[in-house]
Amino acid sequence: MLFRSEADLSHYRQELKAPREGARGLSSYPHPWLMPDFWQFPTGSMGIGPISAIYHARFMRYLTHRNLLDCQGRKVWGVFGDGEMDEPESMSALTLASRERLDNLVWVVNCNLQRLDGPVRGNGRIIDELEKLFRGAGWHVIKLIWGSDWDGLFARDSENALLKAFANTVDGQMQTFAAKDGRFNRENFFGQNAALSQLAQGLTDEQIDRLKRGGHDLVKIHAAYAAAAAHRGQPTVILAHTKKGYGMGQAGQGKMTTHSQKKLDESALLAFRDRFQLPLSDAQATELAFLKPSEDTPEIRYLHTRRQSLGGYLPQRQTQCDTLPVPDLTHYASFALQPEGKEMSTTMAFVRLLGQLLKDPVLGPRVVPIVADEARTFGMANLFKQVGIYSSVGQQYEPEDIGSVLSYREAMDGQILEEGISEAGAIASWTAAATSYSVHGLAMLPFYIYYSMFGFQRVGDAIWAAADQRARGFLLGATSGRTTLGGEGLQHQDGSSHLVAATIPNCKAYDPGFAGELAVILDRGMREMLIEQQDVFYYITVMNENHAQADVPASVHADLLKGCYRFAAPPSRVKAKAPTVTLMGSGAILGEVIKAAALLADEGIAAEVLSVTSWSELARDGMASDKEALEGGVVSTPFIHQMLANSQGPVIAATDYVRAV
């Protein structure tokens, strides 16, 4: 574990400057790329954290039920904001959590009642709203509303005047109370009627100002957390009432501008010091000196004791885990490498490859097939009986097709994650599996297969978040092919997913035209992730159209992985000094490129064909060469330049994707 030092803290948001001064710095947001030994999860974008927490808790159950890892006793804690609950992803999977009885999941929703621009519910009450939503979805709700300072007032309130006043106070007004001092709150809250005024008698303005909301009371926080940890049979949410900018006083507590507060002036710093009774001199306070108790103080000894009792220090992140052997390519992919001209689609070829990998005694149990209600579309129904569909309660019914070899079989140790019509849920499951090597120290190999149009274009933000978490796995954009999918309707015809994939640095995107190419790419990806433990994931488009498959000999594998290889020289029937042209094609269009070469040969034009497996990998290689030139070092020749070095005529590239790819 690499701890962060005071030198790192003093270089907050100065990671470039820090190494020159013997430090590493501290990123402004938790991020596994900026601090790979420290942060497990990134914090953006809003809404992705909540749904990820739910599916991660479910994935832990999956690991336990499949006897891969005992996750009993472990919990997923998610800390979110009340404003974040407006994101659709935040609330979209609440019923899955209750349906799966995920009592290993606890959410803490910080209800400070404020968004960046203003109140979350100025004319309403967000805590009441969230309570109804969570209870209706089957969650256990713990309301952490008022601190211990209020207990005596509630005890003396025989007329329930406080409860009535709170019930009639909308959040916009509650924010105003948070921003004002004790005198204002005495006059405007307790001054509403005689019963409230009587309750406030004997309290000074300062005491009224110090009345805590529940989310700032350590005793109440402990009670809420203990209750959440002990609850069984349901997921739990703690709705914690707080003040934004707590303790900042007039400088920022409860202010509309609190979020954009960049720094405090000297008077505000001294007021903050006094408010929390910090043992700092005026000079130390205004110079922002760190306050750290010495190692032999009761506080520090207590913290070390608790962390040791709880199993270690947090945050921390594992970067490596045990390697996982990958079977030899010929053991499971001979049908693809040497298909002898058989016709099949690359989507079907992938399903066959997946089925073979699932049978491997070592790698097979770590494979996680994920679908969002399209398994039958992709020809995966044969896997239902082979490995089963995961269900936390097994199968308590007799499926209609029980006599079929494609019968819908659910089981507690089922391997397929069938997520229904929820691409957001499927990608959350994929992320949980793809980061298991780091979070759980257990390498898993997820394959999420979906209609290619409903991946990056549908859940691109979640895929970016997975990339931030240094995910390892495969995304399969299936039944791709803009020109070959016209019958499905325009909304299914993907011409842009590879463009989006190319924007993610640790995503390698391929558009293979043949099953053998696909097999070679899968093999390389598995070795890169499971043996070399590189933090990359692959996006591969696989086609819907059946066509004759070509052999992919070992001699072209290296070039294929770089992005293209020489598929066919000009036909021998073309005259030696005939005009020449180089044709390049990928994926669904490669077959048309091959046909075009034959037509050109009939016209006396010599056309060689390059099969392009990845436009983005070719582009990245070229950009790497440009970078070398800018840095003044040894400049390597881009691979595409090498491939086209002997081309004599025009070069024509064809793809099913937008030209920017």
Kindly give the residue locations of the regions a language model identified:
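Conserved short loop/turn motifs at secondary-structure junctions
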Residues: 80-83, 115, 119-122, 372, ...
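Glycine-rich phosphate/pyrophosphate-binding loops
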Residues: 60-70, 435-455, 474, 508, ...
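Catalytic-loop motifs flanking and including active-site residues across diverse enzymes
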Residues: 1, 47-54, 89-90, 264-268, ...
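Cofactor-binding active-site loop characterized by glycine-rich and histidine/acidic residues
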Residues: 1-100, 123-124, 380-383, 396-433, ...
